[in-house]
Amino acid sequence: MVKKKAFLPLLYLTSIVFLPWWISLSFNKSLEFWITNWWNTRQSETFLTDIQEKSILEKFIELEELLLLDEMIKEYPETHLQTLRIGIHKETIQLIKMHNEDHIHMILHLSTNITSFIILSGYSILGNEELAILNSWVQEFLYNLSDTIKAFSILLLTDLCIGFHSPHGWELMIGYVYKDFGFAHNDQIISGLVSTFPVILDTIFKYWIFRYLNRISPSLVVIYHSMND
């Protein structure tokens, strides 16, 4: 009975780790057909972000330049000009396909992430007992650590998350999340998040040290400040 009680939380933890991957894989395959069909048959109005509009405009400017080049080389044989026109036409069709695929992927990723969040929330509520057991294990493990190890772990974690070299890591992580939700890459938004999010985390962490650690373990705070200095 004791082994069963210990096994269920571990099984629950494993399922929590692999469930998002399984949901993403399953729903991407099942929803892709329906979203593609809906976009191609019912979508009558085009919505473009500033980044997408700029990208498409640049592509059309390139095509326009090719057309101007076409006018400038009228002395070339008709077969050559015909080949050039066909190439421009194919490029235009490819541009439209890329635009449609970008929107389909954005809707697909957004739908999958919302569905995953709902399923994981329900799964967490249903597994409240297992979460309580896992939480007690974590608290017991942390309690048995020495103050020096705790201070070293906190210092290492803070340096990784909000240290001098952390902006590049935040840029990669925020860019990945931004892309995972299907949004077009935007350097201004990502740069703004990278410059503000670690600052917010740093403020929350200092408040946590002041309100929580000072109350439960003053010696840990002293060791942490000594190592940090």
From Swiss-Prot:
TM helices/strands, residue ranges: 7-27, 106-126, 189-209
Record-level Gene Ontology MF annotations: antiporter activity; proton transmembrane transporter activity
Alphabetized Pfam families for the sequence: CemA
Tree of life domain: Eukaryota
PANTHER family, alphabetized: CHLOROPLAST ENVELOPE MEMBRANE PROTEIN, CHLOROPLAST ENVELOPE MEMBRANE PROTEIN-RELATED
Family (UniProt): Belongs to the CemA family.
A cellular component annotation (GO) from this entry: chloroplast inner membrane
Protein name per UniProt: Potassium/proton antiporter CemA
Alphabetized UniProt keyword annotations: Antiport, Chloroplast, Hydrogen ion transport, Ion transport, Membrane, Plastid, Plastid inner membrane, Potassium, Potassium transport, Transmembrane, Transmembrane helix, Transport
Localization: Plastid, Chloroplast inner membrane
Role, per record: Contributes to K(+)/H(+) antiport activity by supporting proton efflux to control proton extrusion and homeostasis in chloroplasts in a light-dependent manner to modulate photosynthesis. Prevents excessive induction of non-photochemical quenching (NPQ) under continuous-light conditions. Indirectly promotes efficient inorganic carbon uptake into chloroplasts.
Reaction(s) catalysed (UniProt annotation): K(+)(in) + H(+)(out) = K(+)(out) + H(+)(in)
Bilayer topology term: Multi-pass membrane protein
